[in-house]
């Protein structure tokens, strides 16, 4: 996937000051974001990295159906405390199926289907995300070694497949609530996420 660096700026946030960089696919116009801290000079060791797919409902509207918003905020806090790290914010709403289909899937979940079956009932993949842009974004930031903040083993393998040296995994268990317990259980049981049983 050809993407190009197009803009950067400082970004003060409630969790500390970061740099925000925008990368664009010149063919589709799709824009992805790197929110970084402490990378003004090339890092000399592994860097905290989270690959976070866009979730309008969770990130912007504080939806309780998922754990995306709390994960994003917890990562910003973690990186700010560490003084170095990057969030790759990928524009892949609804695990890559888009906002409209995501809301259609939500309607099916309201009828009792889990997050996997809801997608499949719409004739869509359970997870349609891609990660081929990550290596270009990390290369631009001079990040060579990664401590990946994730519970998803597929992300670890996807980054390794891009030639990224993932040296460690940092678990992230936040945002559990009565509305998303079934969703989190489904991610563990059907999508192989690395939650512990006592996380639920």
UniProtKB/Swiss-Prot annotation:
Q: What is written in the cofactor note of this entry?
A: Binds 1 zinc ion per subunit.
Please give the Pfam families that the UniProt record associates with this protein.
GTP_cyclohydro2
Q: Where, by residue number, is the active site?
A: 127 (proton acceptor), 129 (nucleophile)
Q: What is its EC number?
A: 3.5.4.25
The answer to keyword tRNA processing applying to this record is no
- UniProt binding sites for GTP: 50-54, 71, 93-95, 115, 150, 155
Q: Which residues form the signal peptide?
A: none
> Part of which pathway?
Cofactor biosynthesis; riboflavin biosynthesis; 5-amino-6-(D-ribitylamino)uracil from GTP: step 1/4
InterPro entries in the cross-refs: GTP_cyclohydro_II (IPR032677), RibA (IPR000926), RibA-like_sf (IPR036144)
Q: Where does Zn(2+) bind?
A: 55, 66, 68
GO BP, one annotated term: riboflavin biosynthetic process
GO terms for cellular component: cytosol
Which catalytic reaction applies to this protein?
GTP + 4 H2O = 2,5-diamino-6-hydroxy-4-(5-phosphoribosylamino)-pyrimidine + formate + 2 phosphate + 3 H(+)
HAMAP family according to UniProt: RibA (MF_00179)
Role: Catalyzes the conversion of GTP to 2,5-diamino-6-ribosylamino-4(3H)-pyrimidinone 5'-phosphate (DARP), formate and pyrophosphate.
Show the NCBIfam families listed in the entry. PRK00393.1, ribA
Similarity comment: family membership? Belongs to the GTP cyclohydrolase II family.
Protein's recorded name: GTP cyclohydrolase-2
Q: Which organism is it from?
A: Acinetobacter baumannii (strain AB0057)
State the encoding gene.
ribA
